[in-house]
Amino acid sequence: MLDSRFVREQADRARQALAHRNEDPVMIDAFLGYDTARKDILAEIEALRHKRNVASDTIAQMKKAGQTADEPIAAMREVSAKIKELEVLLAENQEKSDALLMRIPNIPHASVPIGPDESANVTEREVGTPPAFDFAPRPHEEIGEALGIFDFARAAKIAGARFPLYKGAGALMERALINFMLDIHTTEHGYTECLPPLMVNAKTMTGTGQLPKFEEDLFKLERWGFYLIPTAEVPVTNIFADEILNEADLPIKYTAYTPCFRSEAGSYGKDTKGLIRQHQFNKVELVKFAHPEHSYDELEKLLADAETILQRLGLAYRVITLCSGDMGFSAAKTYDIEVWFPAQNRYREISSCSNFEDFQARRANIRFKRPGQKGTGFVHTLNGSGLAVGRTLAAILENFQTKEGAVEIPDTLRPYMRNMAVLSL
């Protein structure tokens, strides 16, 4: 959530930022309209309170003098009733103003390229060389079905479309990748592992920005009012909701493996085969709570932490900076990491690393205290995938496939897979 003072004092910048994000700048004008009305109502309430205080003094003096005060008492009651009406109106105005502010996206950082869509994204670097095959590489879903490690037909029978069923070495590799990623992030990168709830309440979803704007993307348990998490970012970021952290403890770094659940609303007909776009998938998440003065340094470190996994696995990838029109609602700056998929002959997203500055922290009320100073400030929150597990597995199948239909297991993953070197029939 944006700082309301920023919207008031820098309305032109806020309008421009919304236009750069393909959002209607009229939201800023609507907010300012509510703000003006709020000030007018407050001024009227204060004037009436002053009038009531004067009347109260007059009544006291009249009673002291033995005079009848029926008329000023009646007038004071009318003033009090009017004040109550205005207070209700003020509360309604505040509710509408807050609801609107919740739907205004974050302001892009100055380093973010301006553009309407992914065509304006900027490639920062390409790392590694995509493999050259002397045969037509097969897609991961075909490889997995042939090896007997995927069973999409039975997954569809059990749950419907866009659900995976891993078997045998496929399930083993998925688990191996999770453990490999967590081990790197905890032992080498300094993250603390946590295992959060997979269901959260609406307040938690609001804190990270999924609600109220993106409810259609979520799975909701209507009877209980819970939501299935779309990413571990949601519960992990909210660990410190409504808390005040010590400045000396920043940055605080967590990593978490969780299943993730997404409705994939609006993706009908896209990536209908394989592991790329699923309703349920596994992901290892990285979350940071950083000092505002150091959050962009922490973003670069977080990006490097996610890249390490791909480097250790020997997968070719590229890093791109998302333009203003392609960024997520809550982000101030985002890097995407895209891994090479030979059968598709293109890069596909496998991680998104973002700095939200104080946007989420203000919604979730996550503050920090500076020693020797009055008051508190909002921390900056960051997160990134470290990595999406199913897509990593799919990339391994495609990049390390052989003409004979086998798959060579990356050296670094073999200790997690009972020292298996090859997946084959």
From Swiss-Prot:
The protein's matches in InterPro entries, at most eight in alphabetical order, are given as: aa-tRNA-synt_IIb (IPR002314), aa-tRNA-synth_II (IPR006195), aa-tRNA-synth_II/BPL/LPL (IPR045864), Ser-tRNA-ligase_type_1 (IPR002317), Ser-tRNA-synth_1_N (IPR015866), SerRS_1_N_sf (IPR042103), SerRS_core (IPR033729), tRNA-bd_arm (IPR010978)
Catalytic reaction list: tRNA(Ser) + L-serine + ATP = L-seryl-tRNA(Ser) + AMP + diphosphate + H(+); tRNA(Sec) + L-serine + ATP = L-seryl-tRNA(Sec) + AMP + diphosphate + H(+)
Key words, A-Z: Aminoacyl-tRNA synthetase, ATP-binding, Cytoplasm, Ligase, Nucleotide-binding, Protein biosynthesis
**One Gene Ontology term, aspect cellular component:** cytoplasm
Q: What is its EC number?
A: 6.1.1.11
What's in the domain note? Consists of two distinct domains, a catalytic core and a N-terminal extension that is involved in tRNA binding.
Its annotated function is as follows:
Catalyzes the attachment of serine to tRNA(Ser). Is also able to aminoacylate tRNA(Sec) with serine, to form the misacylated tRNA L-seryl-tRNA(Sec), which will be further converted into selenocysteinyl-tRNA(Sec).
- Official protein name in the record: Serine--tRNA ligase
Organism of origin is Desulfosudis oleivorans (strain DSM 6200 / JCM 39069 / Hxd3) (Desulfococcus oleovorans)
Gene name? Answer: serS
